[in-house]
A protein has these predicted regions:
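Alpha-helix C-terminal capping segments
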Residues: 75-82, 109-120
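Short, Asp-centered acidic motifs that coordinate Mg2+ and/or phosphate
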Residues: 87
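A cross-family phosphate/adenosyl-ligand binding-site feature
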Residues: 3, 17-78, 82-84
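Short glycine-rich anion-binding loops that position phosphate/pyrophosphate groups of nucleotides
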Residues: 9, 38, 67-68, 93-96, ...
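Glycine-rich phosphate/pyrophosphate-binding loops
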Residues: 115-137
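Electrostatically charged, flexible surface regions
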Residues: 71, 136-254
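Glycine/threonine-rich flexible loop motifs
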Residues: 96-105
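Short beta-strand segments
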Residues: 33-35, 65, 90-93, 123-125, ...
């Protein structure tokens, strides 16, 4: 099985190294095509107004001056060519990708691009807690990742579907199993704008989520992570809401 590994945190990210270890537990044919720099939050964007620059790091590792989606396209269509990947793994992201995160995430978008190209694709992310990004428990993803990916592949991924996996902020032995969960929703009132002024008196801003108690919905990816369970969420490319489609069709045909 040929595996293409990518991410949105960049070619030097520790999560990418973790995912390479996971991939090599599954196959000895692993290729890496990742962004040259951090592309967190770029979602499914493509570089249409700038050329893509490709740098070969080693025989099977490449860095791209572009987005995660650019990396998948270059990896599949140019680097691997006629011998394309059987599986695309994206991550392991530095921080969870749950709830509304999936609409912003370059990690998720890379898996989406793989799905568009007809390749089984899985996005993986490692949550972190009060300790912040500097204290991520990569061992959680590293130890549980291979068996979770194997089970997903054994179960099967239908066309047009990608799988979003999130590992909780805990040691591997503390994981309370796997939860197949729905995409959750956060309290967007917690999103804050931090206004500041630079040394020249010019204003600038940071976006951040304020820390507050929040009860995630039952059966959601947020709830699973809070309960120290690995969340597995199927996502689909078709964003059509069928009930609303039917309701609007009836309304406009009246």
């Amino acid at each position: 099985m040929r595996i293409l590994v990518t991410n949105d945190d960049g070619i030097h990210a520790p999560g990418l190294a973790t995912l390479e270890e996971i991939a090599r537990e599954l196959s000895d044919d692993v290729w890496v095509v990742a962004p040259e720099s951090d592309q967190s939050g770029v979602s499914h964007s493509l570089s249409l107004n700038d050329p893509l620059r490709l740098r070969q790091v080693s025989e099977t590792r490449f860095a791209v001056k572009g987005t995660p989606s650019d990396c998948v396209i270059l990896g599949v269509r140019h680097i691997l060519g006629e011998h394309g990947p059987d599986l695309i793994l994206s991550g392991v992201n530095r921080g969870q990708n749950v709830a509304e995160d999936v609409t912003y995430s370059g990690t998720i978008a890379a898996a989406m691009e793989g799905t568009i190209l007809g390749i089984r694709s899985i996005a993986l992310s490692q949550a972190y807690g009060a300790g912040g990004r500097s204290n991520l428990k990569w061992d959680c993803a590293r130890e549980h990742g291979p068996q979770v990916v194997r089970k997903i592949l054994e179960t099967g991924i239908e066309p047009g579907i990608l799988i979003n996996v999130n590992f909780p902020d805990c040691e591997p032995a503390e994981v309370q199993g796997v939860a197949v969960a729905a995409q959750g929703f956060r309290n967007q009132a917690l999103l804050s704008i931090d206004a500041r002024v630079d040394g020249r008196g010019n204003p600038y801003f940071w976006l951040a989520f304020a820390k507050a108690r929040f009860e995630p919905g039952h059966g959601s990816d947020l709830k699973a992570i809070a309960e120290k369970r690995i969340s597995v969420t199927p996502l689909r490319l078709d964003l059509t809401d069928e009930p609303t489609l039917t309701r609007f069709a009836q309304a406009f045909s009246a």
